[in-house]
């Protein structure tokens, strides 16, 4: 990085590996808009509030590197835990207000503090011009934008549209943990989203009830939340 001059623009995509077309679309966007494209691969332990989730997270580093090579990603940063965390270091505490009080923030305590901790560390190391994140994790995207403001940084955050399977299922590294039958059943989530998009006039209470009813009648779904939120605050909208 020390060889990169200030005249060069740096595009950065932080990932936890197990790369799929969603990740690769971020790299492609960076290649198009920036002089230098950097991707990091690091499974961040502080954003997992479930030890089994961390232990089972897919590790496909060789395949990941091959995919990045095919896209001509300029630099791949693959730090070890000790490169980023002191021994015994915990996640940093942040105050993102209402951005973290609903949805993933409610059901995965500590997740966003861990995510923001590692993103801040990576931003300080890479010092990108633009950082690319997927819109699939919309709550995370809004928190990263808030993080940059708290850092008083000039890093630009770009959200890239969700990449989906032909079935409509959003591309996700954790899809690899699903059986083929479970993947087919998960399409119901996309169908519910489309229904809401096409029936906005029915009103928020009706749409939330519709999603809840559709998902809860399937025994393989355990619904944690179904929310319609204000983009800038992530606060649920009830009417």
Predicted regions and their residues:
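Acidic/histidine-enriched ion/cofactor-binding microenvironments in catalytic or ligand-binding pockets
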Residues: 239
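Nucleotidyltransferase catalytic core that binds NTPs
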Residues: 1-222, 228-235
